[in-house]
UniProtKB/Swiss-Prot annotation:
GO MF annotation terms: glycerol-3-phosphate dehydrogenase [NAD(P)+] activity; NAD binding
Residues annotated as catalytic: 204 (proton acceptor)
Binding-site residues for NADPH, renumbered to this chain: 11, 34, 116, 153, 268, 292, 294
Broad class of enzyme this protein falls into: oxidoreductase
Pathway assigned in UniProt: Membrane lipid metabolism; glycerophospholipid metabolism
Binding site for sn-glycerol 3-phosphate: 116, 149, 151, 204, 257, 267-269
Keywords: Cytoplasm, Lipid biosynthesis, Lipid metabolism, NAD, NADP, Nucleotide-binding, Oxidoreductase, Phospholipid biosynthesis, Phospholipid metabolism
GO BP, sorted A to Z: carbohydrate metabolic process; glycerol-3-phosphate biosynthetic process; glycerol-3-phosphate catabolic process; glycerophospholipid metabolic process; phospholipid biosynthetic process
Protein name: Glycerol-3-phosphate dehydrogenase [NAD(P)+]
The enzyme's E.C. designation: 1.1.1.94
Catalytic activity as recorded in UniProt: sn-glycerol 3-phosphate + NAD(+) = dihydroxyacetone phosphate + NADH + H(+); sn-glycerol 3-phosphate + NADP(+) = dihydroxyacetone phosphate + NADPH + H(+)
Lineage: Bacteria, Pseudomonadati, Pseudomonadota, Betaproteobacteria, Burkholderiales
Function: Catalyzes the reduction of the glycolytic intermediate dihydroxyacetone phosphate (DHAP) to sn-glycerol 3-phosphate (G3P), the key precursor for phospholipid synthesis.
Amino acid sequence: MKIIVLGAGAWGTALALSACSNPAARHTVTLWARDAAQAAVMQARRENVRYLPGVNLPPALGISSARLSDASAAPDSFGRLIDGADLLIVATPMAGLRAMLAHLSACRVPVAWLCKGFEVARSLETLGLLAHEVQAQEAPDLMAGGLSGPSFALEVARGQPTALVAASVHAVVRDTLVAAFHSPTLRVYANDDIVGVEVGGAVKNVLAIAVGLCDGLNLGLNARAALITRGLAEMTRLGVALGARAETFMGLSGLGDLVLTATGDLSRNRQIGLALARGQTLQQAVDSLGHVAEGVYSARTVVQRAAYLGVEMPIAQAVVALLDGQMKPVEAVAALMGRDPANEQP
């Protein structure tokens, strides 16, 4: 299978490495970087120094920096790069998804994105969108879906056991993703509930900020468990309101990804919460991280979509108030604990 991974960040690099290293599959894999200088360094050193340092890139993994605007048949063009591909993986952050899908809109092979989050609203009159909603606007004819689940890039790159979910309404996309990435170290399940999988991937980032804050304030394991459990309830309520199946949130892309992102110190969103608990400003926390933490950008959109649908999400609302500087960390905790008693609802 010819696989092209578009985006040479940590996750794109790790997934390309995993597919290339699968001894049973014998895929032909190329990792595309937008930055030609980054591609040159990766080619020379066989290492993604910026995003995945210390991990060796095997000789069989192709590296490209073909210009997106070049659709010609020249040997080094983007058009030639994706010609004959069996699967295209979009490994950009959420903010770059729309532009990449526009470039791929005429493709007739399966396309899958890795980003987790909501696209920020494009105007005051619109709401932020999930990835499949962006695709419906930008490239409606694509056979597309997403690959999600609890997965730190570094562990996947090291070949540590991981389970993911391939989500799409198209069976051919699900089947292609399973065939591309299922391996002795990477187990891939299929799910046709693309809405549920995407909501889980987006909301867990916001909740991980809250859990990071909780742990940074040394509030204890009881508080952490309460946040994760009630956060899962918020995630499920929003997902069901958007058309997802409730049971999806008990799977890898819901509970699984939430637990990992909220408690694992490799989580960027958790690190934002920990930094805020230490007294850093949001800008300081983002700058010190050096990578995209999707929860920072998705939090407001999550709350806006919930409000539009009449869905109650107090934890997500507290995170937004914290990120906007409307509350201090201790005030956010007090606001959550001071809510009126209620029956437990999923």
